């Protein structure tokens, strides 16, 4: 099966629109802050920010901007365009879905002007609708190849698949372990607040940490299992999950360098040490997985299955062609006297 041209155009337009919306919110925050670098440290979770109006974006917005931009630019000629659109839609749903209840909740009263909250809520509805259309387009936009040169989905190479499985599988295990830890430490009620965002100070378009970590676990786990079985969707989905890990790990590394946490690593508490080590592992694993999965995939050979050539009756030999068995091929013309 191939991905039709109409579906590719639809996906490219939707991704471009999503990238434009995210870029507009980022530009809005940059214009409201005194210094652009202050917005970066706000994204990294380093305290308050001097701004005429509270920031709306979070660290996930530049990640979304990068994903939507890359997919919009490559979907027209990519062999895994359908999987890329599905992965972009899934990431957008995972990040923006909490806005439906966070922006209209009572605990957000007083954190931002009502008109700003209304604009953010309407924007969230539009973005979620576009994400759903992306997923539907990815699932319904397949067609039958019209030529032997049509772009068909490719699978990750064996070495790439093993690398992605190990890195993303380990990241999923680490992030899941942290959520188990916080669930036991906080108790059920407080942990549910961590998932819904009720007890968390975050920007209007932010994602509750418990919800975000659960999304990272699911994305990494799905990509890791898909890579293990060599499925075409594992490459785009793995790159999306790796982009999340790289973004979070990059912010953690910047914070650690700013406050010299690496130099005084031994002075940190055990939880702080493990948290920093986990985020730095996510940075390394995400970067390596991105580079590995960005390599061109392998196309399926015609008539070949997972364990070699397909079973069945061999094609009859034609005179003048090489044979498939032992011995020399038949001569191109009969010898004299035949």
Predicted features, each with a name:
Residues 11-21, 57-60, 64, 84, ...:
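Hydrophobic alpha-helical transmembrane segments of polytopic
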Residues 77, 81-143:
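Hydrophobic, ordered structural segments
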Residues 1-10, 68-88, 132-163, 218-241, ...:
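Cytoplasmic membrane-interface segments at the C-terminal ends of transmembrane helices
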Residues 25-63, 97-123, 177-215, 251-279:
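Membrane interfacial helix motifs at helix-loop boundaries and amphipathic/re-entrant anchors
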Residues 14-28, 91-96, 125-133, 158-184, ...:
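Alpha-helical transmembrane segments of multi-pass integral membrane proteins
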Residues 1, 299-338:
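Intrinsically disordered, low-complexity Pro/Gly-rich regions
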Residues 111-135, 161-168, 266-291:
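Alpha-helical membrane-associated segments of multi-pass integral membrane proteins
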């Amino acid at each position: 099966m191939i991905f039709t041209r109409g579906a590719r155009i639809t996906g490219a337009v939707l991704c471009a629109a999503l990238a434009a919306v995210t870029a507009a919110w980022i530009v809005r925050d940059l214009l409201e802050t005194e210094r652009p670098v202050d917005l970066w440290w706000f994204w990294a979770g380093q305290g308050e920010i001097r701004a005429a109006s509270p920031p709306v974006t979070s660290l996930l917005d530049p990640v979304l901007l990068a994903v939507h931009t890359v997919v919009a630019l490559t979907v027209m000629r990519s062999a895994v365009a359908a999987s890329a659109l599905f992965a972009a839609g899934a990431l957008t749903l995972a990040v923006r879905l909490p806005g439906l209840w966070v922006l209209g909740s009572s605990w957000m009263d007083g954190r931002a002007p009502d008109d700003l909250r209304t604009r953010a809520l309407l924007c969230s509805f539009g973005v979620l609708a576009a994400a759903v259309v992306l997923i539907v387009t990815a699932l319904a936009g397949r067609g039958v190849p019209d030529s032997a040169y049509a772009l068909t989905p490719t699978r990750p190479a064996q070495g790439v698949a093993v690398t992605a499985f190990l890195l993303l599988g380990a990241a999923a295990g680490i992030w899941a372990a942290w959520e188990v830890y916080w669930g036991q430490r906080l108790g059920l009620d407080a942990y549910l607040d961590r998932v819904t965002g009720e007890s968390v100070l975050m920007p209007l378009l932010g994602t509750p940490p418990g919800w975000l970590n659960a999304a990272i676990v699911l994305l990494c786990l799905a990509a890791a299992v898909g890579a293990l079985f060599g499925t075409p969707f594992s490459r785009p989905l793995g790159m999306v999950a790796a982009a999340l890990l790289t973004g979070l790990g990059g912010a953690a590394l910047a914070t650690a360098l700013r406050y010299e946490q690496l130099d005084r690593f031994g002075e940190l508490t055990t939880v702080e040490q493990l948290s920093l080590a986990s985020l730095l592992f996510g940075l390394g694993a995400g970067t390596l997985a991105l580079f590995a999965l960005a390599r061109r995939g392998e196309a399926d050979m015609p008539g070949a299955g997972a364990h070699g050539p397909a079973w069945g009756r061999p094609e009859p030999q034609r005179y003048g062609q090489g044979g498939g068995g032992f011995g020399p091929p038949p001569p191109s013309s009969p010898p004299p006297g035949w």
